[in-house]
Amino acid sequence: MNICFLMGKIISEINFKFMIQGKNKSIAIFQIEVENKTIITVKGYDEIADYCYNQLQKDNYIIIMGILDYKGEIEITEIEQFTLK
């Protein structure tokens, strides 16, 4: 398990879906762009998916702690929104 910390800007719409089978009930998937212009796909499940869908939108800045999966995507374990001044 690889834990990572990322800070970036949301550059895509947040795609929210309900899941029929499996241990999770919902998923939110979106992309962020980090400081060096790398684009990373991130995803959150259940409560995190609800938070992402209801509280975040394109062009928001976020800080996340997550786990790198086998596809190179980040599964969010903690997320925080912030503003640049």
Q: What do the PLM-derived regions correspond to, one by one?
A:
Residues 1-85:
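Single-stranded nucleic acid-binding surfaces, predominantly the OB-fold ssDNA-binding core
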